[in-house]
Amino acid sequence: MHTYQTLTLAEANLILDAAQAKAEALGVPEVLCVADNAGYPVALRRLDGGKVTSVQIAMNKAFTAACHRKPTHMYKNALPGEEAFGIFTQHEGRFTVFVGGFPVLVEGQVVGAIAASGGSGEQDTEVCQAGIDALVRHLGKK
């Protein structure tokens, strides 16, 4: 039998606080989602000016990163003409290959994911990394 850990609401909010601060520093109106280890949202924030359409995209990025245990941009083989093209039609269309979804690992185990939608791929990545870094610092202090 396996025991799985997942992010708590407090940890999700810690991640989102740091990600939001980074998004605001970049001047990007992001939608941010932290999911549990099963890909379901624990916490979601739509920053002022964040696009309504980015809400579902952020949730899908978090789902993909948590459930498939890889950053969403690692699925380039799902683009047209590639081996895994069409995988995005699975899981009710929730699988996504857009940049900006990252698994959150603790001691090598995926405990959840963070995703950002609303900026460029580079901005989304920076915002997510700020959230992950905040959790790492927090856990290091325990």
Feature-to-residue mapping (PLM):
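Flexible, solvent-exposed loop/hinge segments and secondary-structure transition points
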Residues: 1-142
